[in-house]
Amino acid sequence: MELELQPLNLPSDNERPFVIAGPCSAETEEQVMTTATQLAQKGCHIFRAGVWKPRTKPGGFEGNGEMALPWMKCVKEETGMLVSTEVATPEHVELALKYGIDILWIGARTTANPFAMQALADSLRGIDVPVFVKNPVNPDLELWIGAMERINQAGIKRMAAIHRGFSSYDKKIYRNLPMWQIPIELHRRIPELPIICDPSHIGGRRELIAPLCQQAMDLGFEGLIVESHCNPDCAWSDAKQQVTPDVLDYILSLLVIRDETSTTEDIQILRKQIDELDNDLMSLLAKRMRVCREIGQYKKEHNMTVLQANRYNEILEKRGAQGALCGMSADFIAQIFEGIHEESVRQQLEIINK
């Protein structure tokens, strides 16, 4: 599928990444201006701050609303930076534009709601402003693309996707699981769409920001949106995932930006080997499916059920152990054989039901 897109034309040093930075929330005028001034001194061109804050539970700081918008306008006037904030309703859009907000982004909870997205799209019709769309809280690429389609069909051509990770009940390392395969697939399907990484919300802890920034660059992301606060330990929201402008500047200075396009004869030879191995894999899978169909015919003739749970568990256990010996994760092997088993069952059901 395709979106009708135009270049973002954002101020940058014409190098990856372009960086959007600022506090999670616009708490006070002093906090906003102090943070913005420090970021501008470090060379940041785009300032971010949450004016309206959707919180998981009531009672937390939900933003200062319209009261904070003049502070954002002041940042723009005094530092020359562009300013950006999150919008979730048509009223937010109207107020943000009234105060000269340069870039709007749409949060994960809003992206997950097609009704809310359509209302925002309708409010943006006829307006030329960059709009960035965060992934929905659940790992649903079609929902993410659908949200961007609604905005694009309203006439917004300057767009980007923000990858902020996906919610999970079991939070071990990350606040939101990165599930990199989803933005990678988004890039494959819409290669001209810029993708921005939000390491603050993926990690949930400031010590994870640096490695997540580097991983995003290694995967070819165009930009970073990072929460930075003049005094992060005293932040009114998400204190643990914010860093000072000095720390952010240090993190950015350590990034290794690799060439996206250059290829050499050596890598072409290796890629040819990959192609040949992929062909071998396809041949082996086809051969395995032929044997599965023969088993399906046997089950039909002997009135056996397709699903043999003990056999399936045996396969997963043995192949997981084999994969570990070969340097592959058990989860990866399980995913592969779950897919193979699903296709085997489908083909056997076709035979039994003929």
Region roles according to the model:
Residues P17-P23, H45-A49, V83-T85, L104-I106, ...:
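Hydrophobic faces of well-ordered beta-strands that scaffold small-molecule active sites
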Residues A36, A40, H45, M67-L82:
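Long, contiguous binding/interaction regions
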Residues M1-I20:
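N-terminal amphipathic alpha-helix/helix-capping segment at the start of soluble metabolic enzymes
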